[in-house]
Protein backbone atom coordinates (compact mmCIF):
# COMPACT_ATOMS: atom_id res chain seq x y z
CA UNK A 1 0.00 0.00 0.00
CA UNK A 2 2.92 2.39 0.68
CA UNK A 3 5.33 1.08 -1.94
CA UNK A 4 6.78 4.56 -2.54
CA UNK A 5 6.02 5.87 0.94
CA UNK A 6 2.68 7.41 -0.04
CA UNK A 7 -0.85 6.07 0.32
CA UNK A 8 -1.93 6.77 -3.23
CA UNK A 9 0.68 5.53 -5.69
CA UNK A 10 -1.73 2.87 -6.98
CA UNK A 11 -4.82 3.92 -5.06
CA UNK A 12 -7.19 6.85 -4.76
CA UNK A 13 -6.06 9.65 -2.43
CA UNK A 14 -7.94 10.45 0.75
CA UNK A 15 -11.01 8.61 1.99
CA UNK A 16 -11.85 7.35 -1.50
CA UNK A 17 -8.79 5.13 -1.30
CA UNK A 18 -10.19 3.12 1.62
CA UNK A 19 -13.17 0.76 1.61
CA UNK A 20 -15.29 1.66 4.62
CA UNK A 21 -16.65 -1.87 5.19
CA UNK A 22 -13.76 -4.09 4.19
CA UNK A 23 -10.86 -2.01 5.48
CA UNK A 24 -9.06 -2.59 2.19
CA UNK A 25 -7.52 -0.19 -0.34
CA UNK A 26 -9.28 0.90 -3.53
CA UNK A 27 -7.32 0.89 -6.79
CA UNK A 28 -7.43 3.91 -9.07
CA UNK A 29 -8.21 2.03 -12.29
CA UNK A 30 -7.62 5.17 -14.33
CA UNK A 31 -3.86 4.98 -13.77
CA UNK A 32 -1.90 3.18 -16.47
CA UNK A 33 0.44 1.68 -13.86
CA UNK A 34 -2.53 0.08 -12.09
CA UNK A 35 -3.85 -1.35 -15.36
CA UNK A 36 -0.41 -2.73 -16.26
CA UNK A 37 -0.01 -4.30 -12.82
CA UNK A 38 -3.44 -5.95 -12.73
CA UNK A 39 -3.53 -7.08 -16.36
CA UNK A 40 -0.05 -8.59 -16.08
CA UNK A 41 -1.31 -10.57 -13.08
CA UNK A 42 -4.17 -11.95 -15.17
CA UNK A 43 -1.65 -13.11 -17.77
CA UNK A 44 0.92 -14.39 -15.27
CA UNK A 45 -1.34 -16.83 -13.43
CA UNK A 46 -2.69 -18.24 -16.68
CA UNK A 47 0.72 -18.84 -18.21
CA UNK A 48 2.82 -19.82 -15.21
CA UNK A 49 0.29 -21.76 -13.13
CA UNK A 50 -2.09 -22.89 -15.88
CA UNK A 51 -5.18 -21.43 -14.23
CA UNK A 52 -8.29 -22.34 -16.21
CA UNK A 53 -10.08 -19.10 -15.43
CA UNK A 54 -10.99 -16.49 -12.85
CA UNK A 55 -13.91 -15.66 -10.61
CA UNK A 56 -13.94 -11.93 -9.97
CA UNK A 57 -15.23 -11.54 -6.41
CA UNK A 58 -17.37 -8.61 -5.29
CA UNK A 59 -17.06 -6.47 -8.41
CA UNK A 60 -20.02 -4.38 -7.22
CA UNK A 61 -17.48 -2.59 -5.05
CA UNK A 62 -15.52 -1.71 -8.19
CA UNK A 63 -18.43 -0.68 -10.38
CA UNK A 64 -19.75 2.17 -8.24
CA UNK A 65 -18.11 5.06 -6.41
CA UNK A 66 -20.16 4.26 -3.30
CA UNK A 67 -19.39 0.53 -3.72
CA UNK A 68 -23.12 -0.19 -3.82
CA UNK A 69 -23.22 -0.10 -0.01
CA UNK A 70 -26.77 -0.05 1.43
CA UNK A 71 -28.20 0.47 -2.04
CA UNK A 72 -31.06 -1.40 -3.72
CA UNK A 73 -30.91 -1.37 -7.50
CA UNK A 74 -34.63 -1.38 -8.20
CA UNK A 75 -34.60 0.36 -11.60
CA UNK A 76 -32.25 0.62 -14.56
CA UNK A 77 -31.61 4.34 -14.09
CA UNK A 78 -29.67 3.53 -10.91
CA UNK A 79 -27.03 1.74 -12.98
CA UNK A 80 -26.31 4.86 -15.03
CA UNK A 81 -26.73 7.84 -12.70
CA UNK A 82 -23.11 8.98 -12.67
CA UNK A 83 -22.24 6.77 -9.70
CA UNK A 84 -20.42 4.19 -11.82
CA UNK A 85 -16.61 4.09 -12.00
CA UNK A 86 -16.06 4.02 -15.74
CA UNK A 87 -12.33 3.34 -15.32
CA UNK A 88 -13.11 0.20 -13.30
CA UNK A 89 -15.61 -0.94 -15.93
CA UNK A 90 -12.97 -0.38 -18.62
CA UNK A 91 -10.44 -2.41 -16.62
CA UNK A 92 -12.85 -5.35 -16.29
CA UNK A 93 -13.43 -5.35 -20.05
CA UNK A 94 -9.67 -5.18 -20.66
CA UNK A 95 -9.07 -8.01 -18.18
CA UNK A 96 -11.52 -10.24 -20.04
CA UNK A 97 -9.92 -9.31 -23.34
CA UNK A 98 -6.44 -10.21 -22.06
CA UNK A 99 -7.56 -13.44 -20.38
CA UNK A 100 -9.33 -14.74 -23.48
CA UNK A 101 -6.46 -13.73 -25.76
CA UNK A 102 -3.91 -15.54 -23.58
CA UNK A 103 -6.16 -18.61 -23.24
CA UNK A 104 -9.30 -18.74 -25.40
CA UNK A 105 -10.55 -21.67 -23.29
CA UNK A 106 -10.30 -19.76 -20.00
CA UNK A 107 -13.55 -19.03 -18.16
CA UNK A 108 -14.34 -15.77 -16.38
CA UNK A 109 -17.14 -15.40 -13.85
CA UNK A 110 -18.34 -12.18 -12.22
CA UNK A 111 -19.91 -11.83 -8.78
CA UNK A 112 -22.05 -8.68 -8.84
CA UNK A 113 -24.73 -7.97 -6.26
CA UNK A 114 -26.25 -5.06 -8.17
CA UNK A 115 -27.26 -6.86 -11.36
CA UNK A 116 -25.67 -4.30 -13.66
CA UNK A 117 -26.62 -5.10 -17.28
CA UNK A 118 -23.90 -6.15 -19.67
CA UNK A 119 -21.51 -7.72 -17.18
CA UNK A 120 -21.71 -11.05 -19.04
CA UNK A 121 -22.31 -9.59 -22.50
CA UNK A 122 -19.65 -9.59 -25.25
CA UNK A 123 -17.30 -6.62 -25.37
CA UNK A 124 -18.30 -6.13 -29.00
CA UNK A 125 -21.87 -5.48 -27.81
CA UNK A 126 -20.78 -2.96 -25.20
CA UNK A 127 -20.50 -5.48 -22.36
CA UNK A 128 -17.64 -6.33 -20.02
CA UNK A 129 -16.94 -9.69 -21.60
CA UNK A 130 -17.42 -12.10 -18.70
CA UNK A 131 -18.45 -15.61 -19.72
CA UNK A 132 -20.84 -15.94 -16.79
CA UNK A 133 -22.27 -13.97 -13.92
CA UNK A 134 -23.28 -15.43 -10.56
CA UNK A 135 -27.03 -15.74 -10.03
CA UNK A 136 -26.86 -14.11 -6.62
CA UNK A 137 -30.61 -14.08 -6.02
CA UNK A 138 -31.14 -17.86 -5.94
CA UNK A 139 -29.28 -18.72 -2.69
CA UNK A 140 -30.76 -15.67 -0.98
CA UNK A 141 -34.22 -16.82 -2.03
CA UNK A 142 -33.71 -20.35 -0.68
CA UNK A 143 -32.48 -19.06 2.68
CA UNK A 144 -35.37 -16.59 2.92
CA UNK A 145 -37.83 -19.38 2.11
CA UNK A 146 -36.35 -21.71 4.71
CA UNK A 147 -36.37 -19.00 7.36
CA UNK A 148 -39.87 -17.63 6.77
CA UNK A 149 -42.09 -20.46 5.49
CA UNK A 150 -42.80 -24.11 6.11
CA UNK A 151 -42.20 -26.24 3.04
CA UNK A 152 -45.91 -26.97 2.61
CA UNK A 153 -46.42 -23.19 2.18
CA UNK A 154 -43.94 -22.83 -0.66
CA UNK A 155 -45.60 -21.43 -3.79
CA UNK A 156 -44.31 -23.20 -6.89
CA UNK A 157 -45.17 -20.29 -9.17
CA UNK A 158 -43.10 -17.88 -7.09
CA UNK A 159 -40.35 -20.46 -6.82
CA UNK A 160 -40.14 -20.97 -10.58
CA UNK A 161 -40.13 -17.21 -11.18
CA UNK A 162 -37.26 -16.61 -8.75
CA UNK A 163 -35.16 -19.46 -10.16
CA UNK A 164 -35.57 -18.29 -13.76
CA UNK A 165 -35.51 -14.52 -13.21
CA UNK A 166 -32.38 -13.66 -15.20
CA UNK A 167 -31.49 -11.97 -18.46
CA UNK A 168 -31.59 -14.43 -21.33
CA UNK A 169 -28.71 -12.76 -23.16
CA UNK A 170 -26.32 -13.16 -20.21
CA UNK A 171 -25.10 -16.59 -19.10
CA UNK A 172 -25.44 -17.20 -15.38
CA UNK A 173 -24.16 -19.64 -12.77
CA UNK A 174 -26.97 -20.83 -10.51
CA UNK A 175 -26.45 -22.37 -7.09
CA UNK A 176 -28.41 -23.22 -3.97
CA UNK A 177 -25.59 -22.27 -1.60
CA UNK A 178 -21.89 -21.47 -1.61
CA UNK A 179 -19.04 -20.57 0.72
CA UNK A 180 -21.19 -17.75 2.11
CA UNK A 181 -23.45 -20.30 3.80
CA UNK A 182 -20.62 -22.60 4.86
CA UNK A 183 -18.43 -20.11 6.71
CA UNK A 184 -18.60 -19.48 10.45
CA UNK A 185 -21.62 -17.45 11.52
CA UNK A 186 -24.02 -18.91 8.96
CA UNK A 187 -25.75 -22.23 8.33
CA UNK A 188 -25.82 -24.53 5.33
CA UNK A 189 -29.16 -25.51 3.81
CA UNK A 190 -28.99 -29.03 5.21
CA UNK A 191 -28.25 -27.77 8.72
CA UNK A 192 -31.20 -25.38 8.50
CA UNK A 193 -33.40 -28.33 7.50
CA UNK A 194 -32.37 -30.81 10.20
CA UNK A 195 -30.62 -28.69 12.84
CA UNK A 196 -29.15 -30.62 15.79
CA UNK A 197 -30.54 -33.96 14.54
CA UNK A 198 -27.58 -34.02 12.16
CA UNK A 199 -25.33 -34.94 15.10
CA UNK A 200 -27.43 -37.82 16.45
CA UNK A 201 -29.71 -39.28 13.78
CA UNK A 202 -27.73 -39.68 10.56
CA UNK A 203 -27.12 -43.40 11.06
CA UNK A 204 -28.55 -45.70 8.40
CA UNK A 205 -30.69 -47.48 11.02
CA UNK A 206 -31.92 -44.30 12.74
CA UNK A 207 -35.60 -43.47 12.36
CA UNK A 208 -36.12 -39.72 12.38
CA UNK A 209 -38.76 -37.87 10.36
CA UNK A 210 -36.75 -34.63 10.59
CA UNK A 211 -33.82 -36.29 8.84
CA UNK A 212 -36.09 -37.95 6.26
CA UNK A 213 -37.77 -34.65 5.47
CA UNK A 214 -34.48 -32.75 5.44
CA UNK A 215 -32.79 -35.16 3.05
CA UNK A 216 -35.77 -35.11 0.68
CA UNK A 217 -35.94 -31.31 0.61
CA UNK A 218 -32.16 -31.05 0.28
CA UNK A 219 -32.32 -33.22 -2.85
CA UNK A 220 -35.32 -31.35 -4.25
CA UNK A 221 -33.75 -27.92 -3.72
CA UNK A 222 -30.61 -28.94 -5.58
CA UNK A 223 -32.47 -30.70 -8.38
CA UNK A 224 -34.83 -27.81 -9.12
CA UNK A 225 -31.92 -25.34 -8.92
CA UNK A 226 -29.79 -27.22 -11.41
CA UNK A 227 -32.83 -28.02 -13.57
CA UNK A 228 -33.61 -24.32 -14.02
CA UNK A 229 -29.98 -23.17 -14.22
CA UNK A 230 -29.82 -23.11 -18.05
CA UNK A 231 -26.14 -22.12 -18.20
CA UNK A 232 -24.07 -23.40 -15.28
CA UNK A 233 -24.23 -24.74 -11.72
CA UNK A 234 -22.02 -24.17 -8.68
CA UNK A 235 -21.43 -26.33 -5.64
CA UNK A 236 -19.29 -25.74 -2.57
CA UNK A 237 -17.19 -28.55 -1.14
CA UNK A 238 -19.13 -30.72 1.27
CA UNK A 239 -22.45 -28.89 0.93
CA UNK A 240 -23.62 -31.43 -1.64
CA UNK A 241 -23.72 -34.16 1.01
CA UNK A 242 -24.76 -32.09 4.02
CA UNK A 243 -21.49 -31.51 5.87
CA UNK A 244 -22.47 -30.80 9.49
CA UNK A 245 -19.96 -28.08 10.35
CA UNK A 246 -18.90 -24.71 9.04
CA UNK A 247 -15.49 -23.69 7.76
CA UNK A 248 -13.48 -21.23 9.84
CA UNK A 249 -9.95 -20.39 8.82
CA UNK A 250 -7.33 -19.43 11.43
CA UNK A 251 -7.82 -15.83 12.52
CA UNK A 252 -7.41 -13.66 15.57
CA UNK A 253 -11.07 -14.10 16.53
CA UNK A 254 -10.73 -17.90 16.98
CA UNK A 255 -7.26 -17.87 18.50
CA UNK A 256 -5.68 -18.87 15.18
CA UNK A 257 -7.32 -22.29 15.44
CA UNK A 258 -7.30 -24.85 12.63
CA UNK A 259 -10.09 -26.94 14.21
CA UNK A 260 -12.74 -25.95 11.65
CA UNK A 261 -10.44 -25.34 8.67
CA UNK A 262 -11.41 -28.70 7.23
CA UNK A 263 -14.01 -30.91 5.61
CA UNK A 264 -14.76 -34.28 7.24
CA UNK A 265 -14.74 -36.45 4.11
CA UNK A 266 -14.71 -39.54 6.34
CA UNK A 267 -18.41 -38.92 7.02
CA UNK A 268 -19.40 -39.46 3.40
CA UNK A 269 -17.22 -42.58 3.19
CA UNK A 270 -18.79 -44.17 6.28
CA UNK A 271 -21.34 -46.76 5.11
CA UNK A 272 -23.09 -46.57 8.47
CA UNK A 273 -24.07 -42.94 7.90
CA UNK A 274 -26.65 -41.45 5.53
CA UNK A 275 -24.43 -38.67 4.22
CA UNK A 276 -23.36 -41.00 1.42
CA UNK A 277 -26.93 -41.14 0.08
CA UNK A 278 -26.93 -37.38 -0.42
CA UNK A 279 -23.58 -37.68 -2.17
CA UNK A 280 -24.87 -40.47 -4.42
CA UNK A 281 -27.86 -38.33 -5.38
CA UNK A 282 -25.62 -35.38 -6.20
CA UNK A 283 -23.39 -37.52 -8.42
CA UNK A 284 -26.42 -38.93 -10.25
CA UNK A 285 -27.81 -35.42 -10.68
CA UNK A 286 -24.58 -34.11 -12.21
CA UNK A 287 -24.39 -37.16 -14.47
CA UNK A 288 -27.95 -36.50 -15.63
CA UNK A 289 -26.99 -32.95 -16.60
CA UNK A 290 -23.98 -34.21 -18.54
CA UNK A 291 -26.00 -36.88 -20.32
CA UNK A 292 -29.01 -34.75 -21.26
CA UNK A 293 -27.42 -31.38 -22.04
CA UNK A 294 -29.80 -29.51 -19.75
CA UNK A 295 -27.66 -26.39 -19.89
CA UNK A 296 -28.34 -25.97 -23.60
CA UNK A 297 -32.00 -25.08 -23.02
CA UNK A 298 -33.98 -22.41 -21.22
CA UNK A 299 -36.62 -23.80 -18.82
CA UNK A 300 -40.20 -23.20 -19.93
CA UNK A 301 -43.33 -24.02 -17.87
CA UNK A 302 -45.68 -26.54 -19.50
CA UNK A 303 -48.29 -26.94 -16.77
CA UNK A 304 -48.84 -24.69 -13.77
CA UNK A 305 -51.60 -25.40 -11.26
CA UNK A 306 -51.49 -22.74 -8.55
CA UNK A 307 -54.41 -24.24 -6.65
CA UNK A 308 -52.80 -27.64 -6.23
CA UNK A 309 -49.27 -26.23 -6.31
CA UNK A 310 -48.23 -28.33 -9.29
CA UNK A 311 -45.62 -27.32 -11.83
CA UNK A 312 -44.22 -29.17 -14.82
CA UNK A 313 -41.44 -27.51 -16.79
CA UNK A 314 -38.97 -28.48 -19.48
Residue ranges and their predicted role:
Residues 260-294:
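Catalytic cores of secreted or luminal carbohydrate-active enzymes
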Residues 22, 45, 175, 264-267:
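Tryptophan-centered motif/residue detector
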Residues 50-52, 70-252, 258, 290-314:
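Conserved alpha/beta catalytic core and glycan-binding cleft of carbohydrate-active enzymes
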Residues 27-31, 211, 271-275:
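Short acidic-aromatic active-site loops that bind/stabilize oxyanions
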Residues 7-11, 27, 134, 184, ...:
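Short clusters of hydrophobic/aromatic residues that line enzyme substrate/ligand-binding pockets
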Residues 1-84:
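Substrate-binding/active-site clefts of carbohydrate-active enzymes
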Residues 6, 22-24, 129, 179, ...:
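Residue-level signal for pocket-adjacent positions within structured domains
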Residues 34, 38-45, 91, 95, ...:
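Alpha-helical packing segments of well-folded alpha/beta enzyme cores
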Amino acid sequence: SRFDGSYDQYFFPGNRGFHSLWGSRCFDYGKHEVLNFLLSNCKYWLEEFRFDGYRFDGITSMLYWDHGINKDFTEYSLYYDGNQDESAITYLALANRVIHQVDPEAITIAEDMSGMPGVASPIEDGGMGFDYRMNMGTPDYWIKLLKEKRDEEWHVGDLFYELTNKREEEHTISYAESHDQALVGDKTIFFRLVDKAIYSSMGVFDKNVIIDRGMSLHKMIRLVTIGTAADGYLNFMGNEWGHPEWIDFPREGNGWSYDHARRLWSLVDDENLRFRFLNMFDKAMIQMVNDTGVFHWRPEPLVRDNERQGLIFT
